[in-house]
Amino acid sequence: MMDFLKRFFGSSQERILKRFQKLVEEVNACDEKFSSLSDDELRKKTPQLKQRYQDGESLDKLLPEAYGVVKNVCRRLAGTPVEVSGYHQQWDMVPYDVQILGAIAMHKGFITEMQTGEGKTLTAVMPLYLNALTGKPVHLVTVNDYLAQRDCEWVGSVLRWLGLTTGVLVSGSPPEKRKAIYQCDVVYGTASEFGFDYLRDNSIATRKEEQVGRGFYFAIIDEIDSVLIDEARTPLIISGPGEKHNPVYFELKDRVAELVYFQREMCNHIAIEARKVLDPFLGTDVLPKDKKVMEAISEACRALWLVSKGMPLNRVLRRVREHPDLRAMIDKWDVFYHAEQNKEQCLEKLSSLYIVVDEHNNDFELTDKGMLQWIEKIGGAAEDFVMMDMGHEYALIEEDATLSPADKLNRKIAVSEKDTQRKARAHGLRQLLRAHLLMEKDIDYIVRDDQIVIIDEHTGRPQSGRRFSEGLHQAIEAKEHVTIRKESQTFATVTLQNFFRLYEKLAGMTGTAITESREFKEIYSLYVLQVPTFKPCLRIDHNDAFYMTEREKYQAIVAEIISAHRSGKPILIGTESVEVSEKLSRILRQNRINHTVLNAKNHAQEAEIIAGAGKVGAVTVATNMAGRGTDIKLDEEAVAAGGLYVIGTSRHQSRRIDRQLRGRCARLGDPGAAKFFLSFEDRLMRLFASPKLNTLIRHFRPPEGEAMSDPMFDRLIETAQKRVEGRNYTIRKHTLEYDDVMNKQRQTIYAFRNDVLHAEDLFVVAKEQIEHVALALAFLILKDAHADHCSLPKIEEWLSYSFPVKLDDQEIRRLGDVDAVADYIGDLLIEAFDVKFSAMLAEFTEIIGSAANAQGICNDILRSVIISHIDEEWKVHLVDMDLLRSEVGLRSVGQKDPLIEFKNESFLLFEGLIRDIRIAIVKHLFALELSLTRSDRPDNAIPTVATAFHNHDNFRPMELTIVGEEEES
């Protein structure tokens, strides 16, 4: 039925394109009409359109004229030089109809899928211009600084010709210039630069003058699938060095390495013994039918199954798995042990290992044997890794009648500190094991200049400046024997998912989005529109070539490279990691094939390498770095030879990454071809392929070195990729559900902080905090007054110690009502506050000689006090939330929903945070003592006072002393 309706009415994509096509015709008509205008007359269109918007016309109504203006300017600029990255380039671009289609879609809030070379950069200029007419912030988000700078200089020239201002944010942009950049009509920059400025404005700035942003209206994200999907699980974090250096990584690194060594040696021994049995059959196609021999083979495969749980990448195991029948037998044991009735046998078998490694879920578990071995290694310090039952420990302290209340409190503090130390050591042990067992050099990271540099799993690019969180980075540093740096403390954090939700309007463009359309729709409410190509795509997509083993696959790849190289075709070989790129490079050198390698280790030469990759006879081996954001242009000889030939050495877990690699060739009507070479030992096939795979292999096994190619195998690959994509989508959605809780709290705190920064009268803000504290105290006092063991005198003692007031017990009992008691306490505190700060204000006025300036100084002082406590308590809260997030997963064991538990407990934590902030502010205000000392000063010295207070510097004209706060710090 649906197919019939689609044939009759067209698909939703076709209907949208048809509707937008009418607008394209209007745009072209406007372009033709504007051709008769002079340059000055055309430039005047910008203020005219702005005024019409201010007068109430919608952007949708202005779209045809605005886009027509941009197209006409592009036509007028043809042949003129534009300086881009220090070079003069000749402008040669006028938007095609398909580009105008994409531009209309982006203004409407779509993600436009446009193929490589179709001109996404120029397409974005039109919606940028249209939305900039509002005077609101308009941002173009790129994947790196180079593209931001290039696009601003190149296509930004159109916007500047029309009288708009453009700015570019790069990592080196100084703070003092960022505010001016954000004032521009259109700003180019990376997601991290925009995101970090948002965090700095809301967590680092201590005055409104230090804030640089001016809001979030419209953003176009280039390579939107990379930013919102690949990077979705990587939050932006502003952090600083932690207060203490955790020595656990240095102390335990050798012992952990030894434990992993024991595991490796044990697995090697088991594998070697199994191979002795299996060696005679590795070169045969059919296993013997003798019952005793088959029993021995089965037991050897059972032993290798155990090896797969201890060292999944063991060489003997991988060699044996090349034989389809032996591979099927190992997998049969895996199915056997996973059956419910065989769980006890499985646990008994696994107990012989020190550590069980779950490669599929990227996890591991220390067995009882491993724990005993660990205890033996650390000797008497074993209990340092045993978690304490805090409820039981506290109960023992309470039951001890010999302890005074003060002693009990001190004991509880000591027990809590001991528990914290044990958790830190246990966490350090787990991260060291993770570093050794699951993190691989030249795949997950590289070692460079005594540092661990993360490799982005999707782009293959080094991520300098980024660090793995939760101590994993320190654990890898210990593993690789580089300098172990201090753990960082988080000051502010936000995920890209929630950052981009701040924009009123969001759009994007990429060459690969349709496979993730469901996620864009459900999480961001963004729809994907596939825009037709300007010229037909001439790429030849060859069927995938499947080989039994990795060894056969590489032999076939080299043979294919040699064959294509003889024809003069430029060749781009895509690899999944630095390790594979270097391995293939060694093989090519052995075969005397000149080539260039592009990976995370030599990314600085990327532009130079890519520039030469389209020349006739060029051979380039690259990681996923070459799969996105690169445009390989062919010379005439290369086009004549058949264009760029793309060879994939494996399928990525995401179909998008494969499509990106294919998209490097056959750009804008050029010839080209793409082919993937796969083996059944590839990670994707090994971990995520269908169980039917072994049956297929046994039936279709070809002779050594011969490829298999069948639509059935293509479906297997697609099924495996969909399975991984579904799992990753679930993880991202799950992460977002937790971050949504944090996001609401973040927005509340940032709104409070901004109110303080922008408040004109901080005395009013301070009194509001006093009233909140008074209400909290009223609840506490009245709740305690009705308790069996009333400690009202202790509360009053604490109150009189913290604040310069004394409560009247009889008055409190007479009032009885929470609101009345809160008003009573609030009046006392506000009266004391007024007395204190009125005297201070009078003293400042006398010294300065200006009541307005004295008021300004007092406002700055109050603002600094309030902001400092918001920031300090928020940092502590972030740590508490991280701990809660890591612990709440265990609640599922008790049949509780971890997310519901997280929401409930985080709400209680947030209530405590707000209370703690307010109490800390009010206590500080009453403990604060300030004095201004007369000195020789210039007339412009007053602003220096406020600045010096913020920076805690010594300053000359007046001396500011803060006392009474040491106990709080």
UniProtKB/Swiss-Prot annotation:
ATP binds at Q99, G117, E118, G119, K120, T121, D631. SUPFAM superfamilies: Helical scaffold and wing domains of SecA, P-loop containing nucleoside triphosphate hydrolases, Pre-protein crosslinking domain of SecA. One of its GO terms (molecular function) is ATP binding. It is a peripheral membrane protein. InterPro entries: Helicase_ATP-bd, Helicase_C-like, P-loop_NTPase, SecA, SecA_CS, SecA_DEAD, SecA_motor_DEAD, SecA_preprotein_X-link_dom. Pfam families: P-loop_SecA, SecA_DEAD, SecA_PP_bind, SecA_SW. Its main location: membrane. It catalyses: ATP + H2O + cellular proteinSide 1 = ADP + phosphate + cellular proteinSide 2. Keywords: ATP-binding, Cell inner membrane, Cell membrane, Cytoplasm, Membrane, Nucleotide-binding, Protein transport, Translocase, Translocation, Transport. Gene3D superfamilies: Helical scaffold and wing domains of SecA (1.10.3060.10), P-loop containing nucleotide triphosphate hydrolases (3.40.50.300), SecA, preprotein cross-linking domain (3.90.1440.10). Its EC number is 7.4.2.8. GO terms for cellular component: cell envelope Sec protein transport complex; cytosol; plasma membrane. Coiled coil: none annotated. It is found in: Cell inner membrane; Cytoplasm. It comes from the Bacteria. GO terms for biological process: intracellular protein transmembrane transport; protein import; protein targeting; protein transport by the Sec complex. HAMAP family: SecA. Monomer and homodimer. Part of the essential Sec protein translocation apparatus which comprises SecA, SecYEG and auxiliary proteins SecDF. Other proteins may also be involved. PANTHER family: CHLOROPLAST PROTEIN-TRANSPORTING ATPASE, SECA INNER MEMBRANE COMPONENT OF SEC PROTEIN SECRETION SYSTEM. Belongs to the SecA family. Part of the Sec protein translocase complex. Interacts with the SecYEG preprotein conducting channel. Has a central role in coupling the hydrolysis of ATP to the transfer of proteins into and across the cell membrane, serving as an ATP-driven molecular motor driving the stepwise translocation of polypeptide chains across the membrane. This is Protein translocase subunit SecA. It comes from Chlamydia trachomatis serovar A (strain ATCC VR-571B / DSM 19440 / HAR-13). The lineage of its organism: Bacteria, Pseudomonadati, Chlamydiota, Chlamydiia, Chlamydiales.
